[in-house]
Amino acid sequence: MTDTSAIFIIVPTADVTSITSELNYVPASLNSEGFIHACEYHQVAEVVSRFFDNHLALSVLVVDVGLINSPLRYEAPSTTMSSPALFPHIYGALNTDAIVDVCDLVHFKHQPITPEIMAVLRHYRFERLPVESTLFKSTWRSSSNNTHGEPVGTAMIGLYCDSLTSVSCFHKLTFDEVWHFYGGDPLELTLLYQNGDSEQVVLGTDFTNGQVCQYLIPAGVWQGGCLVEGGQYALFGCTMAPGFTGSCFTAGIADALIEAYPNEEKVIQKLSVNGHQTTMPEGFAT
């Protein structure tokens, strides 16, 4: 056993909504074998290659060990694996409130999730933002609308962490956005301006080294963000007035951005988690 803060369950992405909408997860293996198969971070890749169709879209359920109601045992697998390490087995239904994140397998880093990050996930109960997959939680959405039908203001809390690939892809908004730094390690925003210039802004608490705790990003500026290298996580917030709606968001495509901003190719490639998606799903944040 190499990590005790989190275990992971691999499921088809198409099943995630039905799994998380129930109080308990009861897969077929619980009836046929008496337990739910899970794995540690370093076992995920082999489990996927051995037991799942490589054409199937898969997601990884991040399960907080401390929240599991059923007995958890570490046992030898029923089939021979490349490593002699024991596998976590859950002997009973999994209460779904122990699932603190759902990560697309293609973005899973196969790294341990520290107890500090698990504590933040447990407390805030983030969701994944469509297109970007950023861990976020909406904290305020005004009940008053402007003349265009948009909320007069919105606020959210977000979490950047590399071990769960929570970043912001390059995107632009039709309204100004104010960023706030709340805690953890510093984060870096890269801004790409229409005139071809770019800028890096570090949000954090070390103002003597140029970090800022608040920053305004003007409407129409390409913005992307991530944890500063070497950190565990960054907790931040964003507020907008008018408020955020799905229709005010446009994500960038890496090739086009690199052509326009060749000096920022490295960070553009790093943050292009959206692939070819450029718009939020219809009806999101309306």
Locate each region found by the language model.
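Eukaryotic N-terminal targeting leaders
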Residues: 1-2, 286
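Short, conserved acidic/polar surface loops in the N-terminal third of protein domains
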Residues: 70-77, 101-103, 190-192, 227-228, ...
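Conserved, structured core segments of small domains
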Residues: 2-112
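Active-site scaffold segments
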Residues: 59-60, 88-92, 214-216, 226, ...
